[in-house]
Amino acid sequence: KGEFDPEYDPKTINSRIRQILNIFEKKVYIGYTATPFANIFIHHEKKTKEEGLDLFPKDYIIDLPIPSNHSGLEKIFNIEKVDGDVVEDREIEDNHFFNIVKDNSLYHDDPDCAEGWMPPRHNRYHIPKYEYQKEDEVPIPPSLREAIMSFILTSACRNYRGYVEDGKSMLIHVSKFQDVQHIVFKQVSDFTDTLRARMQAGHYLHDDTISKFEEIWHKNFYIHKDKTEEKMPTWQDLLDHKYSLKFIVNEVCRNIKVLNGKSDDTLDYDNFVNENDFGLHTIIIGGDKLSRGITLEGLSISYFLRSAKMPMYDTLMQMGRWFGYRMGFDDLCRLYTTDNVIRWFFHISVATEELRNTFRIMASQGATPLEFGLKVRTNPNLIITSKTKMRNARKEQTSFSQEVMEIITFMKNEETVHSNFDTTN
């Protein structure tokens, strides 16, 4: 059954899985994924010579409930629903999780800008340089300085809360080019070394650096103390604790890592805590290697500037390492990124929730994916998944133009009825 697809050359892992399945007469294959976009576009009848039929989930797709302690798209964006349907067009509300970066390029609103510290368009020979730094400053933008200092503050707060032995990580993902990543590593190292030198000075409590730490703490974290059930230390608590700011700055300086194909750096949180009486405090710089397969324990601060002309839903989701379980420090997590990236993720969050809702409806009707039409919301600035995976998909546009729609169900909720009446009155 099924016809051969001569234009399809499956990837190695897909090929090997299918060849293993072909060995057995009775078999079960269950896929578990957070990005199901590519799976639903697999053709259910196309096959290849060596592998046979592809891995379309013909029997069922189950939407697993999101645990209450998981910080995912829906929670971060506070996705709004009305009677189960996602509210499509609304402004992204002020959310202290996001810090919009505008100083990474000379013209932050120009997607084709190639000037500045880390502009949207740069190549492997790019030298990151912030145009407006003072003569004695490290050439990184203020947003990255603040992000690094925020990481030091959140680490101090977590130590105060009793999570001393837990790993604490910051992610810096700004370029896909390994040579550029190593320059960023040098700049970040120089900046943290400067912080350490100032913190170790005898009069450090009167230094501008400590004043800046205090300002960031109150502006970005302590101001939200009434919105969390976790203990929120005062500024003095952070200074007086055994594992204080001064201690953390020193640890961070020793543990800045580059994770890419040219680096020998590794992450070993367990071994570190076994050799010390506290967890690893580390800043991790990288690119594509960080998108999957590497656990960033205790990730609280992410600085993410990757850009593409037409990014893919699933690739962006894999890069979004800030999604996950953040027990005891969910209120301290922050993402520094551009407003474009925020809009991309908001759209993906709406598209994902709509797809999950479709899976729930399909299951409630007892239908299978073979019987049920599955669709994913598109965006003119994004691609759902790779063109190879979408070769059997087709694009459709829905419109109510020249259509007569008959309403056969009515809302009972009094508030909804009054709202509809006011809207049409």
Model-derived regions, located:
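Conserved RecA-like P-loop NTPase helicase motor core
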Residues: 23, 258-343
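A short acidic (Asp/Glu
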Residues: 2-4, 39-45, 74-75, 180-188, ...
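Conserved P-loop NTPase catalytic core
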Residues: 2-157, 169, 204-212
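Conserved nucleotide-binding/hydrolysis micro-motifs of P-loop NTPases
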Residues: 35-39, 68-71, 176-179, 290-291, ...
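Conserved C-terminal RecA-like helicase domain
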Residues: 1-6, 134-139, 143, 157-283, ...
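C-terminal catalytic or substrate-handling cores of phosphate/nucleotide-
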Residues: 116-119, 124-161, 167, 175-178, ...
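Subunit-assembly interface segments of extracellular/virion macromolecular structures
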Residues: 1, 31-32, 282, 287-292, ...
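C-terminal, active-site-flanking charged/polar segments
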Residues: 53-62, 189-197, 300-329, 356-360
